[in-house]
Amino acid sequence: MTKTLPKDFIFGGATAAYQAEGATHTDGKGPVAWDKYLEDNYWYTAEPASDFYHKYPVDLALAEEYGVNGIRISIAWSRIFPTGYGEVNLKGVEFYHKLFEECHKRHVEPFVTLHHFDTPEALHSNGDFLNRDNIEHFVNYAAFCFEEFPEVNYWTTFNEIGPIGDGQYLVGKFPPGIQYDLAKVFQSHHNMMVSHARAVKLYKDKGYKGEIGVVHALPTKYPLDPENSADVRAAELEDIIHNKFILDATYLGYYSEMTMAGVKHILKENGGELDLREEDFQALEAAKDLNDFLGINYYMSDWMQAFDGETEIIHNGKGEKGSSKYQIKGVGRRVAPDYVPKTDWDWIIYPQGLYDQIMRVKNDYPNYKKIYITENGLGYKDEFVDNTVYDDGRIDYVKQHLEVLSEAISDGANVKGYFIWSLMDVFSWSNGYEKRYGLFYVDFETQERYPKKSAHWYKQVAKTQIIE
């Protein structure tokens, strides 16, 4: 049976400042840790990215033409405060005013994120969110933006607190490139959640008219053998690292007994301890019912198997299928079942996982209010022919995920919109320019945009709300 979505559903496209803007040192922008880290460790940099800094009128005109009525944008913190605090860079402020004005002119509602992986270098080198001083700097930056940009109706504090801790301190593919430090992972999660809570409370206390939430990446975790209690435990522990710890902080205002028991077990196996303070929990408690919405980024699920050995993680950054490895001491290892398809980057394609995660949020955290799917899409080595890309695989991927959204809505979940990652091709943090996600193909040499087959398909779905 053909599935449909509600008439008021937002069909959006997602971007991020550092992945799209380029212009990394233009008009007074301060450095971020990624600038040097990419030069030192990867085969690409964030120049020119998609040159969104100059090309945003083109991208927003395409959005309007192709029925995209929402856009995720992030503000580059170091465009506003080049060192993270102190003097304001007025040219950066002016850029975002012009960008938001263009969004509204094109009837594309901006959903604006304050932090999308790009802490200013001065604060990053000072410990990033492991340093509690930077909680204060973030809250002050948020306060400035809330006051300066009243034209923004939808704010999110952070994009993917989980993958930030994961990328920086577990996998080590984000600066500062530390591996296997689980205590730092959890401390980063916690301190960022405290930062989120304080910013949300401030927003509500000031009585601003818009809405505010947070974007979490929530990959669903399953036991490889549901009948094997050790596999079930491995999936539970992996879920605590990536999902439950953060969701508890967001919606309970504390960490449940089960969550903390898992954290203690993981740290007993891997070393380290956490600094969790009473005032932190006061901040979390004060904000737990103030979130207007939850953004869920969902690309994949994982299957976990019990494992007795040392931690080893190999990141597949070049799309060499089968080259990744993930096993954590005292937790488990990822083993993909044969029946699930995978991308060249070993990401497991499993739309049912999105349904299961939405229903988990609905059932376990009933104060969630509403959900937007803030990222979902398929990374591909797109073939550019006839001035387009015949990306049937991407269409199929998005179609399947929209269908499970329709099912979740039918089953009582309040899902209000979907943002495809990404609106146009952007650069990928740890994969470069080869891994493309956009509805619009970007020739990174000329910065020309070309609609892919998926753009035409998405336009039709947005117009009719019928998924076919």
From Swiss-Prot:
One of its GO terms (molecular function) is 6-phospho-beta-galactosidase activity. NCBIfam families: lacG, PRK13511.1. Its EC number is 3.2.1.85. It catalyses: a 6-phospho-beta-D-galactoside + H2O = D-galactose 6-phosphate + an alcohol. The active site is at residues 160, 375. HAMAP family: LacG (MF_01574). GO terms for biological process: lactose catabolic process via tagatose-6-phosphate. Pathway: Carbohydrate metabolism; lactose degradation; D-galactose 6-phosphate and beta-D-glucose from lactose 6-phosphate: step 1/1. The lineage of its organism: Bacteria, Bacillati, Bacillota, Bacilli, Lactobacillales. InterPro entries: 6P-beta-galactosidase, Glyco_hydro_1, Glyco_hydro_1_AS, Glyco_hydro_1_N_CS, Glycoside_hydrolase_SF. D-galactose 6-phosphate binds at residues 19, 116, 159-160, 297, 428-429, 435, 437. It is an enzyme of class 3 (hydrolase). SUPFAM superfamilies: (Trans)glycosidases. This is 6-phospho-beta-galactosidase. Belongs to the glycosyl hydrolase 1 family. Pfam families: Glyco_hydro_1 (PF00232). It comes from Streptococcus agalactiae serotype III (strain NEM316). Keywords: Glycosidase, Hydrolase. The gene is lacG. The keyword Methyltransferase does not apply.
